[in-house]
Amino acid sequence: MKLKLFLMTSIAVAVFEMAAIAQDTAKPVEPALPDAPQATAAAMIHPNGPTVVMDTSMGRITCQFFEKQAPKTVANFIALAQGTKDWTDPQTSKKMHNKPLYDGTVFHRVIPEFMIQGGDPAGTGAGDPGFTFEDEFDPNLNFDVPGRLAMANSGPGTNGSQFFITEVPTEHLNQHHTIFGQCDDPSINVVKTIARVQRDGNDKPVEAVVLKKVTIIPEGQPVPPAPGATAQTPAAPQP
């Protein structure tokens, strides 16, 4: 299984990197730092649909889906998160039924000023759920703002379970990876913290960053408090 890669900066660089990947998929080249964000129509598309809450060992990440723009991708993520879609354990080749995929997995690849990547049931970057599905690109939805939740892939039509969250605009990824959610500002701060942990030569955290629990919140419903947080009591009315 190929490592999920998504580093393309220009047509010339992409051709060079594709050749390099064919020889060694373990050490992709980091992209150049992106330019300052530009005001585009993409920023006008608002998230719609359910919200995903990812409780990690380093804090909570909350993102609302783009259900209208990426319905198949959102449905796949929700089904894997809730255990309503069968998947194959890449380590045992065993078919998993009624078992959430994401709970207990790790962020296996983190790069400052770029993104954090997770969703691999093998925890290595080479695993997948035993199936793939097609991309869903919206011409007005791009990587022009931080906090994009998107699918990792190894080429067109190779989406599975792996995803990444950006911490900066990364427009060289436009129309190469399906964007299916937008994370809020506090979550982007968590992403930045995770991206700056100590890493090995393959950008894997030395100390595991665990995705403890993934919860799907229906649209319009409140997000429950983070584990360990206490509910805030409303202030007493003034006389």
Task: Give the predicted meaning of each segment.
Residues 2-8, 17-239:
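Cyclophilin-like peptidyl-prolyl cis-trans isomerases
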Residues 11-13:
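Repetitive helical segments and hydrophobic/amphipathic motifs
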